[in-house]
């Protein structure tokens, strides 16, 4: 039962205490409205947390993208910050894409989420609301990281998270419900990380004081309309890049070359190793009569491989650093 609703973000609460905490949090909720979406230079924000997401530097990237494109290709979709910004500008007639828009990712579950937002937004939202309401109603503090029943799961929010994580790893992966769980886990796990091991998704609970917003109905409807013509493809970069033709534009945001041994570099069980970076760089150099833009970390392997190309340094905030999440790093964008 929903008794309280935030007027700004439309998030719903069944308990007055959680509703009050939400209203009084230090960082107020700022949610896109229909009027915001009509403004010039409005960029739709991503609905997922994602390691290496480009929201904070989107303006540095978007100015390097051509205003007239044959086919648009995004080879490492992830959280979709750049794709959503490009589509926002296309909607404002500031970028012209003559033919098709392709978005690729090696994570098939992520691709399914985007596809379900395209075609099944109502049912997706119902599932999200169902699980978020159940989570929000839990008040206990007894932690069970291996619950075997819904009663054990409801002993605490943390227990419920692990119950959902197990369900996510064991259920049919092509369903709308699985995509809803993907989105739920993304906002309740540790800092939005996506990481898989031999037994599936394995990121721990995020310990958030306030029940997070998964996605508002306004944003879901707007994004569904925005991405309606995008072709989402589950594919590795080596296969995706073969689809690029003369006159096309390619944006690449691969797992970054590690700055050190502790850097987070991949979200699938296979990771993204040094040989894959070298193979990617080799394939990029084969792009002739094709415009491209790549984001990466500013390390020797990147700068040495792309000496002949244009580049620009960007200061960005680190997304995952448990000791100092507010620290910054230097990234680089490479383009031709």
Predicted region positions:
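Conserved proline-anchored active-site loop of SAM-dependent methyltransferases
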Residues: 61, 72-86, 103-108, 114, ...
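Mobile active-site "lid"/loop adjacent to the S-adenosyl-L-methionine
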Residues: 196-210, 256-277
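C-terminal recognition-helix end and immediately following basic linker
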Residues: 1-36
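Long, positively charged, glycine-interspersed low-complexity recognition regions
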Residues: 257-258, 267-336
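A mid-sequence, solvent-exposed acidic-amphipathic segment
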Residues: 218-246, 250-251
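S-adenosyl-L-methionine
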Residues: 35-73, 81-82
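Class I S-adenosyl-L-methionine-dependent methyltransferase module
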Residues: 92-228
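Conserved SAM-binding loop of SAM-dependent methyltransferases across substrates and taxa
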Residues: 81-97
């Amino acid at each position: 039962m929903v008794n309280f609703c935030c007027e700004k973000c439309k998030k719903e609460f069944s308990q007055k205490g959680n509703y009050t905490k939400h209203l009084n949090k230090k960082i107020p909720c700022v949610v896109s409205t229909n009027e915001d979406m009509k403004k010039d230079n409005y960029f739709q924000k991503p609905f997922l947390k994602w390691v290496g997401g480009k929201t904070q530097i989107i303006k540095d990237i978007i100015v390097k993208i051509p205003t007239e494109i044959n086919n648009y290709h995004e080879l490492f979709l992830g959280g979709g910050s750049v794709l959503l910004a490009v589509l926002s500008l296309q909607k404002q007639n500031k970028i012209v894409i003559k033919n098709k828009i392709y978005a690729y990712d090696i994570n098939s579950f992520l691709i399914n989420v985007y596809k379900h937002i395209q075609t099944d937004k109502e049912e997706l939202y119902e599932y999200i609301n169902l699980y978020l309401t159940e989570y929000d109603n839990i008040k206990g503090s007894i932690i069970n990281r291996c619950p075997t029943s819904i009663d054990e799961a409801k002993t605490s929010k943390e227990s419920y998270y692990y119950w959902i994580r197990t369900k996510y790893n064991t259920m049919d992966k092509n369903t709308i419900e699985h995509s809803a769980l993907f989105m739920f886990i993304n906002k309740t796990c540790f800092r939005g990380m996506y990481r898989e091991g031999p037994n599936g998704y394995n990121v721990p609970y995020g310990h958030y004081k306030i029940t997070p917003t998964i996605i508002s109905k306004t944003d879901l409807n707007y994004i569904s309309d925005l991405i309606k013509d995008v072709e989402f493809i589950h594919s590795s970069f080596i296969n995706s890049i073969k689809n690029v033709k003369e006159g096309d534009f390619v944006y690449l945001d691969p797992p970054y070359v590690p700055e050190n041994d502790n850097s987070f570099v991949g979200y699938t069980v296979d990771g993204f190793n040094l040989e894959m970076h070298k193979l990617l760089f080799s394939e990029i150099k084969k792009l002739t009569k094709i415009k491209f833009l790549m984001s990466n970390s500013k390390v020797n392997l990147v700068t040495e491989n792309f000496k002949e190309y244009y580049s620009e340094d960007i200061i960005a905030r680190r997304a995952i650093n448990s000791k100092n999440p507010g620290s910054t790093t230097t990234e680089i964008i490479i383009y031709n």
